[in-house]
């Protein structure tokens, strides 16, 4: 199992080559990249985007790091989901991800609308949405990771349930699309933000080996989507590791920690901080391996 982390802020601060070298020196073997096609100034809008992707992959791989996972853009309103030009951005994201060498591209479900009371309509939209992506997954040889979400209550402003934020719905989404190219990406930190009786380990066991192929690993205090490193919040990492081992999880251990855990540090401390984050990941992976079927 590769241990991986989101590289965006490190690349922004230090460039791709040094960013990859920093995480390699910290014990990581892979990284995750955000494909920011939702920004007008994104490099991926260049006519040379294929060469840019190939060159970026070569640069990162030269430091011993693989790009195993990407994240599709998600800052858009629900009423844009079926616009042809908008859908093309997601197809292009899959193409870029494939050139980069990624195995999974995480694509948020459509959830930019009020969820409670509209669950079935949102479900129908999302099943259609993911099924439309399947032929392109096949073309580019990449899987789409469906992520469990949360949202703010329209009136109270408190965190509430959203798409795939319960075990039965998450399982239903994956099974309804029914494609080897559409898998689950469990965001550990999102699970307990709503008043959820199911914990991350329950999601892991329910999704099981065949559905769960990707992770967004981070911690929080159940009050905000803090994206802390493990053991700095309230999640039960021993139970998470146990469950991942029990299902013989074969994906990567991929951090999605907050940019400020990197951005706010003096440059002199970056290397040591990354080694600390790497040590946490290695420890949890060792616990996963200890719980695999014998």
What is the predicted function of each stretch?
Residues 32-57:
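Glycine-rich, proline-tolerant flexible connector loops at the mouths of alpha/beta enzymes
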Residues 42-50, 79-84, 116, 264-265:
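Metal-dependent catalytic neighborhoods of phosphoester/phosphodiester hydrolases
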Residues 9-11, 35-39, 73-76, 109-113, ...:
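Active-site-proximal loop/turn and secondary-structure-junction residues that shape catalytic pockets
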Residues 1-6, 68-77:
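N-terminal small/glycine-rich loop or linker at the start of catalytic domains
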Residues 1-4, 9-29, 61, 87, ...:
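Histidine-acidic metal/acid-base catalytic patches
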Residues 32-33, 67-72, 103-109, 144-148, ...:
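Short beta-strand segments at enzyme active-site cores
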Residues 43-47, 84, 159-160, 227-231:
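Short glycine-enriched, charge-decorated loop/helix-capping segments at active-site entrances
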Residues 55, 59-62, 78-186, 193-194:
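Active-site acidic/histidine proton-transfer and metal-coordination neighborhood
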